[in-house]
Curated annotation (Swiss-Prot):
The keyword Amino-acid biosynthesis applies. Homodimer. This is Bifunctional protein FolD. GO terms for biological process: L-histidine biosynthetic process; methionine biosynthetic process; purine nucleotide biosynthetic process; tetrahydrofolate interconversion. It comes from the Bacteria. Its EC number is 1.5.1.5, 3.5.4.9. GO terms for molecular function: methenyltetrahydrofolate cyclohydrolase activity; methylenetetrahydrofolate dehydrogenase (NADP+) activity. Gene3D superfamilies: Leucine Dehydrogenase, chain A, domain 1, NAD(P)-binding Rossmann-like Domain. It comes from Rickettsia prowazekii (strain Madrid E). It holds the Pfam family THF_DHG_CYH_C. Belongs to the tetrahydrofolate dehydrogenase/cyclohydrolase family. The lineage of its organism: Bacteria, Pseudomonadati, Pseudomonadota, Alphaproteobacteria, Rickettsiales. It catalyses: (6R)-5,10-methylene-5,6,7,8-tetrahydrofolate + NADP(+) = (6R)-5,10-methenyltetrahydrofolate + NADPH; (6R)-5,10-methenyltetrahydrofolate + H2O = (6R)-10-formyltetrahydrofolate + H(+). Catalyzes the oxidation of 5,10-methylenetetrahydrofolate to 5,10-methenyltetrahydrofolate and then the hydrolysis of 5,10-methenyltetrahydrofolate to 10-formyltetrahydrofolate.
Amino acid sequence: MVNNIIDGKALANEILADLKLEIQGFKEKTKTSPKLAIVLVGDNPASMIYVKNKIKNAHQVGIDTLLVNLSTNIYTDDLILKINELNLDKGISGIIVQLPLPSSIDENKILSAVLPSKDSDGFHPLNVGYLHSGINQGFIPCTALGCLAVIKKYAPNLNGKDAVIVGRSNIVGKPLSALLLQENCSVTICHSKTCNLSSITSKADIVVVAIGSPLKLTAEYFNPEAIVIDVGINRISHNKIAGDVDFENVKSKVKYITPVPGGIGPMTIAFLLKNTVKAFKNAIAL
């Protein structure tokens, strides 16, 4: 099959180009620009790479950044105090807390501490509630937004489509299920306790995989007309990463597929920055 590999980087670059123009307009009109605060706890190598990429892309479109790098040994209450400082800083448009956090920190308390109006990641319970209630307000998790944008690019009319999401995380599975329901898909969420997974995924028009298990889903899990969205990022050797789908053996057996890297990762960052711009616009009532 020719040209069935989805170039997430190219799609993300289109979004970034639009954001750059929009931010240039802000600067001319208001003499201000968005600013994203990134809270990084500890020195997890993978987290540091993700943060570096977010900062790089932010600067490319004209978003200022503030990196708040804190000790692994910080207490939950002290981290909340730091987040409250950022909440009160009128120069900060959006705030994200890089996950995962050390096990000693209460993640739910931290995500709830971020002001909902500055919640660029869309993880605050209020924003989660808006999404699942179908209220067009607040912020939606970036990876879920990125997945939906890719799906709609290749299947503009989702009415009645069968979508299967493998993985039930708060970052991908649950929010994406809400978004696809709003697009009138019939949505099935599968997880580690699902029996006969391939019998479910092989009937789907759209399969999104986000389980954190390298090369887990092979060709028999999909039908030839499927759009396959691979959200997994797994390090399988010192210098190689792979998704949750056996890409090399699946790519010729499906209609469209996202690669890893170069698929959903760039789209996630693009929508993080898009959320930050949205927060900035809301704050100054543009």
